[in-house]
Amino acid sequence: MEFWKLQGSGNDFVVIDDRDEKLESFLKERGVSKEDFVRKVCAFHTGVGADGLILIKNPDNPENDFKWEFFNSDGSVAEMCGNGSRCAVRFAYERGIVGNKVRFETLAGVIKAEVYENGRKVKVQLTPPSKPEEKTLTVDGEEVIGVFINTGVPHFVVPVEDVEKVNVIKLGRAIRFHEEFQPKGTNVNFVQPVSEDTIKVRTYERGVESETLACGTGATACAIVSYLKGLVKKKPVNVLTRSGEVLTIDFSEDLKEVFLTGSVYKVFEGRLSEEVLEY
């Protein structure tokens, strides 16, 4: 089974063209669930290694170019992934599935995208976010003040003075599983203003269950919250991710239009062996 590995801002994904729907029968014949398949392929050391896996499918509505199924590395399904969407668009563009302007279906709704620089840069228009809600949590006896917002998937944004001093794994995990966000939990972001149009972000991702090098919907959540709280004064907002890459977030004042732009890199093409299922 052929696949590509792509990454955007250090967020890496395995992408498979499954428009012929052969994967379902392949897994059924071998008694492997799709969740187990994803976990095995995304596993580092014994699999390809990735933050998530994307299946490109035929669209339900012929007006759209394709539909995707997105899985976190633990096999769970996610409604949306900003960086994953940019990687999916580059894959579809290079495979001749789409042109420079793209519409594709996700569980969060139809996503529009534009391709630049022969696929090396992709701009996606995300679905409008939920209304931001400030919340005060008690975590290990301490108050944590942040803002909850859904930018396709749920995010809790915590402004801090220095993101380098945050124990992202410990605090992020505690917030991710906090009773306030049950049963589905939330992604957790720590944001530090750098200048009037730039922020630095670190993210604990639900489904990956660790800090990731970047998160597109998380960067978007942080940019919106930072602007609304006056931590930055100008748009578009530049987001410095853990990978060192910069994501650019722009949005209308009423938040009905939200755009995420960044570079996408093709890492390699490969073919999965059936032996990956043995681990």
From Swiss-Prot:
Location in the cell: Cytoplasm
Keyword tags: Amino-acid biosynthesis, Cytoplasm, Isomerase, Lysine biosynthesis
One Gene Ontology biological process: lysine biosynthetic process via diaminopimelate
Residues at the active site: 81, 215
Positions bearing the site annotation: Could be important to modulate the pK values of the two catalytic cysteine residues: 155, 205
Biological or metabolic pathway of the protein: Amino-acid biosynthesis; L-lysine biosynthesis via DAP pathway; DL-2,6-diaminopimelate from LL-2,6-diaminopimelate: step 1/1
MF GO annotations: diaminopimelate epimerase activity
Listed Pfam families: DAP_epimerase (PF01678)
Main location (coarse class): cytoplasm
GO-annotated cellular components: cytosol
Recorded family membership: Belongs to the diaminopimelate epimerase family.
Self-association and partners: Homodimer.
Function statement: Catalyzes the stereoinversion of LL-2,6-diaminopimelate (L,L-DAP) to meso-diaminopimelate (meso-DAP), a precursor of L-lysine and an essential component of the bacterial peptidoglycan.
Name of the molecule in the record: Diaminopimelate epimerase
Gene for this chain: dapF
